[in-house]
């Protein structure tokens, strides 16, 4: 399963671990993804989404109805 946020589209990034001796090895920076259930009052049901912590803040700010409308417009839900 892809580690992608449904709302923001955040994906893993690549970078380096850097030791004290300045040796570099490749690593991945993973997004902080959580499975969350949101109650949608207009539909009278729960919606389960895999979202990043930044997306949780967005949902708190604009509301789940606006976010779901955007997801449906993009064809992701």
From Swiss-Prot:
The keyword Ribonucleoprotein applies. One of its GO terms (cellular component) is cytosolic large ribosomal subunit. Pfam families: Ribosomal_L28. InterPro entries: Ribosomal_bL28, Ribosomal_bL28/bL31-like_sf, Ribosomal_bL28_bact-type, Ribosomal_bL28_sf. Belongs to the bacterial ribosomal protein bL28 family. It comes from Chromobacterium violaceum (strain ATCC 12472 / DSM 30191 / JCM 1249 / CCUG 213 / NBRC 12614 / NCIMB 9131 / NCTC 9757 / MK). This is Large ribosomal subunit protein bL28. GO terms for biological process: translation. Keywords: Ribonucleoprotein, Ribosomal protein. The lineage of its organism: Bacteria, Pseudomonadati, Pseudomonadota, Betaproteobacteria, Neisseriales. GO terms for molecular function: structural constituent of ribosome. Residues 1-21 are annotated as: Disordered.
């Amino acid at each position: 399963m892809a580690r992608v946020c449904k709302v923001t589209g955040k994906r893993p990034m690549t970078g380096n671990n850097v030791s004290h001796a300045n040796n570099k090895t490749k690593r991945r920076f993973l997004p902080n993804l959580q499975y969350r259930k949101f109650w949608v009052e207009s539909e009278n049901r729960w919606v389960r989404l895999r979202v990043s912590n930044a997306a949780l803040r967005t949902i708190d700010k604009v509301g789940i109805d606006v976010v779901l409308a955007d997801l449906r417009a993009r064809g992701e839900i």
